[in-house]
Swiss-Prot record:
Major role in the synthesis of nucleoside triphosphates other than ATP. The ATP gamma phosphate is transferred to the NDP beta phosphate via a ping-pong mechanism, using a phosphorylated active-site intermediate. It comes from Deinococcus geothermalis (strain DSM 11300 / CIP 105573 / AG-3a). InterPro entries: NDK-like_dom, NDK-like_dom_sf, Nucleoside_diP_kinase, Nucleoside_diP_kinase_AS. This is Nucleoside diphosphate kinase. Keywords: ATP-binding, Cytoplasm, Kinase, Magnesium, Metal-binding, Nucleotide metabolism, Nucleotide-binding, Phosphoprotein, Transferase. NCBIfam families: PRK00668.1.
Length: 138
């Protein structure tokens, strides 16, 4: 079974989308093995988005992700990384397929409701940033 890191970003939490997104995850058959609502510190945000540090939008990205609570989720299931990314849809909601989370709920590329790891390496790194091993179900 593959594990991945998923996040409901501040815009999704603020708009009350957490129950709907969790329902979609469970309906798809993924197992939630870790879940916490939290505020992300600037330090954690900068570590999480380290690959974007040199990009012009880095500061705005860190400001946004620290602007309110997020829901950090550890998912487990067959092809969880690709499956969760397919459920989210394209980063730009205008390009997201109908029925995806971003097509249904995102307003802009910057405030696009969800995050998901893009590779096994990213999933392992991001899960370790947001969860201790003893916080995850076996």
């Amino acid at each position: 079974m593959e594990r991945t890191f998923a996040m409901i970003k501040p815009d999704g939490v603020r708009r009350g989308l957490t129950p709907e997104i969790l329902a979609r995850i469970q309906k798809k058959g993924y197992r939630v093995v870790g879940l916490k609502q939290m505020l992300i510190s600037r330090e954690l945000a900068e570590r999480h988005y380290a690959e974007h540090r040199e990009r012009p939008f880095f500061g705005e990205l860190v400001d946004f992700i620290t602007s309110g609570p997020v829901v950090a989720i550890a998912l487990e299931g067959e092809n969880a990384i690709a499956g969760w990314r397919a459920m989210m849809g394209a980063t730009n909601p205008a390009n997201a397929a109908p029925g995806t989370i971003r097509a249904d709920f995102a307003t802009t590329t910057g405030e696009n409701v969800t995050h998901g790891s893009d590779s096994p390496e990213s999933a392992a790194r991001e899960l370790s940033l947001f969860f201790r091993e003893d916080e995850l179900l076996k």
